[in-house]
Every structure is written in structure tokens, then in C-alpha cells.
């Protein structure tokens, strides 16, 4: 009798995706982040489900319902801290996953890459609407400022903003619909993750060398299941350390005050994982221009496959492009820092230079470096 996992219609799918999947023998720890993101998504859905059992999406009771979860619900404080810091872990893994894709040329799997970028946008939307739910000061003003950006769209902008708000300001209707969106979006994300994996398994994984790995494949289980388990252990350790010992380290102190439409916080800023995009938005002194730059900061990822000029796939053997890649990483750190600073000199000019450099590196400098490296590969005799 053949093994059930190879014959049963459902088990066969799981087997082909996680057990007998042929994987390159040389993929490094940078390939762990896909599985870590899957775990993050499961953690977020489970903790979110338990929070939703006790949360009320009403402007009068939302803030106190979150306080009630932390004070009166069994392990409510832990569930809430895991959910809030789980989002930070999610984005940490996301950024590293995307960075890996850029470094090793994984973006040349165009379908997998494109759905990945759409996934990134969807997760960002989910995190944004989720941040509004506790109805603290920064929740309220963050929602007001970010939704207001849509009013920059010519002709339909103002109508669109009021339609999203469900009134003339961020109020009860806004909170209720944001809760509905925050509940449904993770399931849409899960469906998209399955499609992401489907496209990936059409081609098989890339590897650090960027060469065709077909000549040397090993089964996913036990080799990469155990390797992923180690990554999972380290991530859960970091998450638990964060949630248990300093749960509010990455949050904003303003969110301990209930939302007050009559009192604007001195510095309105989003969570750390949006600061780089927020810095790009603020670096352009025009509203519509800023909104377009904000959108482009993520959508530029979609054109990276079209800008690949090198004869080699990976950056492993391309020292000039490596320098530019790490310059891009440093630039993103700079933008993240600037996004959290007040709008005054010298932060304004640093943000503007960093924003220009961000787009310049991706659109011009890295493709040019690829061409230069191609030229340097040619024998000169």
C-alpha cells in the first residue's frame, strides 16, 4: 500500500508543498523568512481572534475595552502584547524577505514577486486599520492624517475621503468599518499567500548563487523543516522577550491617552515600520506629489524585474552592486529615523536627500552598475 500522504487528495497537496518538495541544497538562513512570515500570520490571526472576542468597535467604549482586555481578561495583557509586537515581528521579517529577494535576484520569478508586492501593500493596509482600533490619540490622528491624503486626488478627493470616513470626520462609522476591514483582510492575505506559494512552486526556489539548482536538490523535509524550526524558535524567543519585558517599547506614548479630536499631538507619526514611507511623503512640500511619492516608494518594487540589466542573477559575485544594495539598506534606516523626527532643519533636508537617493538607487544606479559589471566581465584581450 502506498503512503497515505502521497495518495490522499488533500495530504498530497501538503506533501508536495512541505515534505517531498525538491529544494536547492545551498539555500541559506535568508530563505527562512517565508516560513517565519507564515507563522507570524497564524499568530496574528489567532491572537486577533481572541482580542476580537472582547473588543468593542464603538468610539465610546473602544479604548476602555482594550484596557479591560489587559486588566480583566485571563492573559489578555499577553494576547494584546503578542498581537501588537507580533505586527513588528511581521514587518521585520517582511523587510528582510523583500531585501533577500532584491539581493539574490528572486524578483526574476515575476509572478511570485508581483503577488508578493501586492501582499506587502495588503499587509500594510491591514496594519494601518488595525492601529486605529485602540482609539488612542495616535490612532485617531494617524487615521485622520493618512485618510486625509486621499483628498489630494483631483476632483473626487474630498468626496472619496468623506465616503471612507462615513461622515465629515473620523468617527464611529470610521472605527466600525476599520474593524470590519481589519478582521477580513488577514484572510484575504492568507488566500494571497497560497497563490504566492503556488507561483513559487511552479519554478522552485532560487538560491544564493543565482545559478540553476536543478542538478542538486534535496527534500524539504527533514532538512529545511528543522532549519525553519530553528528560525521559528529564535523569532518566538525575540517576540516573547519583546511582549513580556518591554511591550510598549515600539509603541507611541500618545496612544495611552484616549482619542481627543480637540487636542492634536505635537508629533503625529505612524508605527516604526511605516516611518520610511512617511519620511518620503513628508519630504515633498506638495500634497499630491507627496502622496504619489508615498505610493511609488512601494510600487517601485514592481518595476525592479524590468530594471535587471546584469548577466548574473544574484549579487553574490557583483561587488559594485553589493555596495549600492547596502547603501539602499542604510538609506532606508536613515528614512526610518527621519520619519520619527519633527519637521525642522536639518531633518527636512536629510529626508529629502534620502528620498531622492532611494529612488535614484533603485531606478538608475543599480541598473547602471549591472551594465558596468557586464562590461567588466568581458575579456579585454
Curated annotation (Swiss-Prot):
Topology in the lipid bilayer is annotated as: Multi-pass membrane protein
Transmembrane intervals:
33-53, 77-98, 113-133, 178-198, 226-246, 288-308, 320-340, 347-367
Which key words tag this protein in UniProt? Electron transport, Heme, Iron, Membrane, Metal-binding, Mitochondrion, Mitochondrion inner membrane, Respiratory chain, Transmembrane, Transmembrane helix, Transport, Ubiquinone
Q: Where does it live in the cell? A: Mitochondrion inner membrane
Further facts: Heme 1 (or BL or b562) is low-potential and absorbs at about 562 nm, and heme 2 (or BH or b566) is high-potential and absorbs at about 566 nm.
Q: What Gene3D superfamilies does the annotation carry?
A: Cytochrome Bc1 Complex, Chain C
- A Pfam family annotated for this chain is Cytochrom_B_C
Q: Which PANTHER family match?
A: CYTOCHROME B
Q: Which PROSITE patterns match?
A: CYTB_CTER, CYTB_NTER
Q: Which cysteines are joined by disulfide bonds?
A: none
Stretches of the chain forming a coiled coil according to its record:
none
Question: What cofactors are annotated for this protein?
Answer: heme b
Positions contributing to heme b b566 binding? 97, 196
Ligand binding (heme b b562): 83, 182
A GO biological process of this protein is:
mitochondrial electron transport, ubiquinol to cytochrome c
Name of the featured protein = Cytochrome b
UniProt lists the gene as: MT-CYB
Q: Where does a ubiquinone bind?
A: 201
Task: Give the principal location in a single coarse category.
Answer: mitochondrion
The record's GO CC annotations read: mitochondrial inner membrane; respiratory chain complex III
> What is known about what this protein does?
Component of the ubiquinol-cytochrome c reductase complex (complex III or cytochrome b-c1 complex) that is part of the mitochondrial respiratory chain. The b-c1 complex mediates electron transfer from ubiquinol to cytochrome c. Contributes to the generation of a proton gradient across the mitochondrial membrane that is then used for ATP synthesis.
Q: Which InterPro entries does this entry report, sorted A to Z?
A: Cyt_b/b6_C (IPR005798), Cyt_b/b6_C_sf (IPR036150), Cyt_b/b6_N (IPR005797), Cytb/b6-like_sf (IPR027387), Cytochrome_b (IPR030689), Cytochrome_b_C_euk/bac (IPR048260), Cytochrome_b_N_euk/bac (IPR048259), Di-haem_cyt_TM (IPR016174)
Quote one Gene Ontology molecular function term: ubiquinol-cytochrome-c reductase activity
Per the annotation, how and in what number is the cofactor bound? Answer: Binds 2 heme b groups non-covalently.
Top-level taxonomic group: Eukaryota
On assembly, the entry states:
The cytochrome bc1 complex contains 11 subunits: 3 respiratory subunits (MT-CYB, CYC1 and UQCRFS1), 2 core proteins (UQCRC1 and UQCRC2) and 6 low-molecular weight proteins (UQCRH/QCR6, UQCRB/QCR7, UQCRQ/QCR8, UQCR10/QCR9, UQCR11/QCR10 and a cleavage product of UQCRFS1). This cytochrome bc1 complex then forms a dimer.
Amino acid at each position: 500500500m502506498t503512503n497515505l500522504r502521497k495518495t490522499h487528495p488533500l495530504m498530497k497537496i501538503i506533501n508536495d508543498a512541505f515534505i517531498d518538495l525538491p529544494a536547492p541544497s545551498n539555500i541559506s538562513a535568508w530563505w527562512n523568512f517565508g516560513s517565519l512570515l507564515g507563522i507570524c500570520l497564524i499568530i496574528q490571526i489567532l491572537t486577533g481572534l481572541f482580542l476580537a472576542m472582547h473588543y468593542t468597535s464603538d468610539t465610546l467604549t473602544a479604548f476602555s475595552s482594550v484596557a479591560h482586555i489587559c486588566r480583566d481578561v485571563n492573559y489578555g495583557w499577553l494576547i494584546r502584547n503578542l498581537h501588537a509586537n507580533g505586527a513588528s515581528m511581521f514587518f521585520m521579517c517582511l523587510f528582510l524577505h523583500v531585501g533577500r529577494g532584491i539581493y539574490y535576484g528572486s524578483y526574476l520569478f515575476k509572478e511570485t514577486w508581483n503577488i508578493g508586492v501586492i501582499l506587502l501593500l495588503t499587509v500594510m493596509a491591514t496594519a494601518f486599520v488595525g492601529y486605529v482600533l485602540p482609539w488612542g490619540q495616535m490612532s485617531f490622528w494617524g487615521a485622520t492624517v493618512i485618510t486625509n491624503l486621499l483628498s489630494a486626488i483631483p476632483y473626487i478627493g474630498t468626496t472619496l475621503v468623506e465616503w471612507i470616513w462615513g461622515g465629515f470626520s473620523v468617527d464611529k462609522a470610521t472605527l466600525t468599518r476599520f474593524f470590519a476591514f481589519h478582521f477580513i483582510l488577514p484572510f484575504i492575505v492568507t488566500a494571497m499567500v497560497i497563490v504566492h506559494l503556488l507561483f513559487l512552486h511552479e519554478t522552485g526556489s532560487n538560491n544564493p548563487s543565482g545559478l540553476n539548482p536543478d542538478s542538486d536538490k534535496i527534500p524539504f523535509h527533514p532538512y529545511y523543516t528543522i532549519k525553519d524550526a530553528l528560525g521559528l524558535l529564535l523569532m518566538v524567543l525575540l517576540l516573547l522577550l519583546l511582549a513580556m519585558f518591554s511591550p510598549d517599547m515600539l509603541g507611541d506614548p500618545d496612544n495611552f491617552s484616549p482619542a481627543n479630536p480637540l487636542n492634536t499631538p505635537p508629533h503625529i507619526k505612524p508605527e516604526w515600520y511605516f516611518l520610511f514611507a512617511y519620511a518620503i511623503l513628508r519630504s515633498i512640500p506638495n500634497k499630491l506629489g507627496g502622496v504619489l511619492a508615498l505610493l511609488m516608494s512601494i510600487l517601485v518594487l514592481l518595476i525592479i524585474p524590468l530594471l535587471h540589466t546584469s548577466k548574473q542573477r544574484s549579487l553574490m559575485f557583483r561587488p559594485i552592486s553589493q555596495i549600492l544594495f547596502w547603501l539602499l539598506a542604510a538609506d532606508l534606516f536613515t528614512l526610518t529615523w527621519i520619519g520619527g523626527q519633527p519637521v525642522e532643519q536639518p531633518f527636512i533636508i536629510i529626508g529629502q536627500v534620502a528620498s531622492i537617493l532611494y529612488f535614484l538607487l533603485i531606478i538608475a544606479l543599480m541598473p547602471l552598475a549591472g551594465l558596468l559589471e557586464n562590461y567588466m566581465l568581458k575579456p579585454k584581450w
